[in-house]
């Protein structure tokens, strides 16, 4: 442990009086201001329903008021009128009503989002906005054909994958949370992490891009120009207009889709924490131990030397030793990777998934998703320190990064040596009772099972953080170059802030790798890729076949976070400027930063982001907007933010 991090472990400077052991251990286990609460509903006849009831709604509309609060708690509204249609046919009637009365409809599910694509923070109860909750009733799932599924857009991804599994089917990749709606995933081009491993051929029904690209047919609420009324219309994937609806950002309303899937392929998921970031994210051609800097700031040393020695033993058991050491190496071998690099630490949590038909002897067999209980249910020490951070102890971020790293290492590998050699405060936080609890469920470093059990691993009970998000489009041979450039700059920027006594990141960097949206994956002749997908290929750069997804996580309200995110975003735009690689934003997360806020830079919103989906020629940004406007000319499905973006 470095001298600076040792000091941090006893008394963290930068907060009034420092963060003493007594203050920390006396803190509430709750997350305080970071906690996300599901607000109750208020019916139209309740005395608490202050806003006038929307006039003239279609008969039988299930109506109530509810606060909209998103995943991170950054978007919170007044009580807004909300309805829950029981059938898809109710939605066109609601759209007709909204048009006639000057209201707008916003589809809503489990609110697992960051960007203001549904509603803006602070939307008042008097706003003429009607939330349409699809998650109550529009949840039907049924078999359409042997390799397709018909699913209503309010169904959860967990329910969808469970249905597919019961039929022996699966997806190659999908978002990690299970409690998110299918409609929400499609709206933003949700993805997982997967590219073909060396020698792997895409099986029928599978794809390496977004979930949206697996759609073969969709039903949307559109205006019928002949009658002037809204109606349900089904678009086959072969129809040109369908490409605008596959990723629509909330500018449309889908009631159901038909998705293609393939025969399920069991996966083996191996976790390891024995490769330092300087090797995992090394520049191409760098020798072992060289790469993206030599340290990660205060706290980097805690898992350092020991992590390398003991992790090497673990790595030998799990296929390490003389095996892959860089991210690109693991991608080449397994095709499916995720790196979680806790702030101010040196050893990322690397997960790799490999297609493995039969259970390996050393693997733990699992038959349900969410197999990382230490991550799903926040351990008490992590909750304590998180509570301290969000109430002002921002300088404890290096300590928090170390704590998260140690919790993951103990729970995954059973190795407590780093805990025993850590500072007094960390040893006190990770008491014998806590360690016993972490180890009680068995080690989780090597899992095997049906794909859905290993693709979904984020519960709503995990830490609620905010995140930025970007996709770097690059040729696969340049994957390691792009990752190493990012890692070096991120480390440099974080260290510069720390040198000034600022700690803008207290979560982690997450890195995933996917393919692009090849419409052949849908199995529909004449299909086009989703026009607004960050994974839409560029016609002029056919060699760009890979996307690297980058997220930086932190608690909302962290001082300097937006300024840090802006500096990082501007660097990404300069570095991946279309010459060797390109950059697109991840719609659901943070982007277009000013020094004060996300989704606020007028140049990014008005020029840079649209141009990223215009570049390369062919149908793209402008065609998508034209199609969506043509099918909803009254902009019933929209909000002021989308009005400014999609123009």
Sequence positions of predicted segments:
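C-terminal substrate-binding/cap subdomain adjacent to the FAD-binding core in PCMH-type
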Residues: 215-507, 512-513
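C-terminal segment of N-terminal export signals and the immediately downstream linker at the start
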Residues: 17, 38-76
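Conserved glycine-rich FAD pyrophosphate-binding loop
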Residues: 122-124, 434-647
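Structural signature of FAD isoalloxazine-binding scaffolds in flavoprotein oxidoreductases
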Residues: 115-138, 192-225, 253-257
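N-terminal secretory signal peptides and thylakoid transit peptides that target proteins
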Residues: 11-32
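Glycine-rich N-terminal segment of FAD-binding domains in flavoprotein oxidoreductases
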Residues: 73-173
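Short secondary-structure capping/junction motifs at helix and strand boundaries
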Residues: 104-106, 168-176, 227-233, 267-268, ...
């Amino acid at each position: 442990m470095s001298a600076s991090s040792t000091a941090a472990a006893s008394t963290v400077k930068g907060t009034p009086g420092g963060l003493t052991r007594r203050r920390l251990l006396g803190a509430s286990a709750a997350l305080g201001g970071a906690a996300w609460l599901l607000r109750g509903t208020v019916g139209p006849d309740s005395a608490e329903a202050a806003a006038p009831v929307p006039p003239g709604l279609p008969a039988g509309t299930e109506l109530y008021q509810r606060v909209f609060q998103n995943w991170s708690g950054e978007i919170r509204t007044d009580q807004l009128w909300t309805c829950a249609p029981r059938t898809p046919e109710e939605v066109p009637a609601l759209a007709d009503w909204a048009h006639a009365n000057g209201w707008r409809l916003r589809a809503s599910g489990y609110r697992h989002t960051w960007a203001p694509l549904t509603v803006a923070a602070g939307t008042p109860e008097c706003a003429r906005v009607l939330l349409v909750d699809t998650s109550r009733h529009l949840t039907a799932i049924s078999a359409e054909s042997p390799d397709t599924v018909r699913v209503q857009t309010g169904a959860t991804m967990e329910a969808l994958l469970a249905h597919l599994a019961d039929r022996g089917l699966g997806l190659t990749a999908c978002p990690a949370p299970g409690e998110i709606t299918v409609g929400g995933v499609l709206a933003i081009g949700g993805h997982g992490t997967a590219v073909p491993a060396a020698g792997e051929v895409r099986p029928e029904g599978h794809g390496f891009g977004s979930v949206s690209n697996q759609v073969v047919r969709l039903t949307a609420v559109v205006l019928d120009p002949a009658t002037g009324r809204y109606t349900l219309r089904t678009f086959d994937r072969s129809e040109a207009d369908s490409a605008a609806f596959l990723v629509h950002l909330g500018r449309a309303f889908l009631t159901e889709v038909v998705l293609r899937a393939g025969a399920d392929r069991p996966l083996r998921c191996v976790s390891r924490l024995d490769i330092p970031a300087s090797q995992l994210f090394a520049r191409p051609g760098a020798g072992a131990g060289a790469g993206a800097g030599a340290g990660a700031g205060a706290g980097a040393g805690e898992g350092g030397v020991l992590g390398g020695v003991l992790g090497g033993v673990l790595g030998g058991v799990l296929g390490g030793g003389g095996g892959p050491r860089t991210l690109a190496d693991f991608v080449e071998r397994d095709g499916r990777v995720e790196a979680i690099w806790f702030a101010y630490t040196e050893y990322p949590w690397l997960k790799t998934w490999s297609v493995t038909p039969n259970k390996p002897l050393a693997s733990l067999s699992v038959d349900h998703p969410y197999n990382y209980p230490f991550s799903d249910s926040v351990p008490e020490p992590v909750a304590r320190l998180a509570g301290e951070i969000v109430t002002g102890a921002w300088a404890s971020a290096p300590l928090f990064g170390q704590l998260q790293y140690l919790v993951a290492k103990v729970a995954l590998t059973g190795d407590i040596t780093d805990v025993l050699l850590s500072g007094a405060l960390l040893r006190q936080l990770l008491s014998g009772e806590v360690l016993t609890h972490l180890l009680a469920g068995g080690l989780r470093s090597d899992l095997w099972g049906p794909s859905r059990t290993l693709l979904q691993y984020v519960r709503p009970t995990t830490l609620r953080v905010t995140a930025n998000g970007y996709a770097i489009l690059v040729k696969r041979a340049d994957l390691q170059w792009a990752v190493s450039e990012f890692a070096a700059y991120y480390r440099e920027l974080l260290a510069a802030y720390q040198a000034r006594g600022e700690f803008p990141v207290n979560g982690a960097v997450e890195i995933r790798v996917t393919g692009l949206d090849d419409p052949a994956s849908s199995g529909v002749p004449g299909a086009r890729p989703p026009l607004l997908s960050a994974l839409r290929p560029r016609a002029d750069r056919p060699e760009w076949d890979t996307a690297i997804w980058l997220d930086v996580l932190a608690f909302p309200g962290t001082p300097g976070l937006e300024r840090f995110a802006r500096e990082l975003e501007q660097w990404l735009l300069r570095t991946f400027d279309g010459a060797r690689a390109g950059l697109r934003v991840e719609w659901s997360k943070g982007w277009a930063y000013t020094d004060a806020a996300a989704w606020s830079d007028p140049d990014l919103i008005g020029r840079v982001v649209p141009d990223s989906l215009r570049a390369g020629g062919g149908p793209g940004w402008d065609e998508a907007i034209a199609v969506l406007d043509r099918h909803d000319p009254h902009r019933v499905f929209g909000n002021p933010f989308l009005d400014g973006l999609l123009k």
